[in-house]
Amino acid sequence: KKHFAVIGLKNTDLDIHVIHPISQFITDNWKNKQYNTQRKHANNVVKFLNYLVDNRKKLNISTLCDLNIVHGTQYLNDLTLTGVKRSTVKDAERTLTHFYYWLVKIDVITNVSKNAFEKKESHLGTYFESPFKPLYPTKTNKEIEHTLPISYIPLLLEVAITVAKPIALGLYFQIFGGLRVSEVVNLKRTQVARRMREGDFILKLQNFRTDLKEHSSVKKARTQRVLEVNDWGHSLFRDHIKLYKPIDNSNALFINRDGKALSQRSYRQYFQKTKDYFINLLENHGDNEQKLIAKHLKYMKWSTHIGRGTFTNIIAEDAENPYEIAHLRGDSNIDSSLTYMVSTERIHKKIESKFSN
């Protein structure tokens, strides 16, 4: 089922939406791309158009025909002043460059020449250099943490069970299977199987949740193995299935307090609650080493993706080559990776022994 992003107009009085012809911009540029890519550019255009509507008197414009390069630069500068990240402004600038070029190409903007868009080459292909000259936010000094020390994983899971039980199983899937948050919330109850011998989980990752928004699609449809360690996964799964049963016919594995399928935003909120409690626990009740870890984790920037990073770190210590890591992470086609199944068993045993000590 193919999804397409479109741009609409909303009558706020009647709450009526109509698709705007400017949606053609998305189709012309990204019709063969993933929905999330289309949606990202559509959102960037919508924010720019709403900015033009809200500031039309100050900018002295009444239609898109009045647009010039200065308007785009001014929008990007105002975006910077709102306190967003540098990457957010850069992303908006890329979309705006495409948008302006498209408007010039179809003769909507006549006071900007095609020569304003210089074509460049990179290792990824050709692109147009931005004609805008905005002020970018300063680069943040806060680094991103990608992994969690292995010895702290059991405590993190215990904290999740205590303060964010609806996602405790999801966190386990991320740490011992490398799942992204979008892949976790897309899971249905019927898409979880277990291998008889090792007890590992076999998850079928696809975009089952067509109701999901906010960049929640599965990046790569695949069958993903999640390692069973010390029976933790089995225990979490058994409790989860008993406690959380959807009432909205979604058959979602992860649900909110109302019994409806869990959104990515809600999952992240649960994770933030776990993170805050975890750091507070180490900070106020830990030994000197744990307090140092708490200080480090408090300073660093980290979120749900730390689960995938930690999984990579765990398996990398015992993998003999990059292909074993790629196979376990789901970076390569699992059906064509039978060569590495034996090494998976070896790595599994080594990982389990680490958590048994």
Give residue ranges: language-model regions:
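N-terminal core-binding DNA-recognition domain of tyrosine recombinases/integrases
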Residues: 21-39, 43-128, 157
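Short, charged phosphate-coordinating catalytic segments
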Residues: 107, 172-199
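DNA breakage-rejoining catalytic core of tyrosine-based enzymes
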Residues: 123-154, 213-231, 247-250
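Basic, Lys/Arg- and aromatic-enriched nucleic-acid-binding interface segment
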Residues: 150-181
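Conserved tyrosine-mediated DNA breakage-rejoining catalytic core shared by Y-recombinases
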Residues: 186-235
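Major-groove DNA-contacting interfaces characterized by cationic-aromatic clusters
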Residues: 231-273
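Short, basic (Lys/Arg/His-rich) helix/loop patches that form interaction surfaces
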Residues: 272-327
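Catalytic-site neighborhood detector that most strongly recognizes the C-terminal catalytic loop/helix
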Residues: 329-354
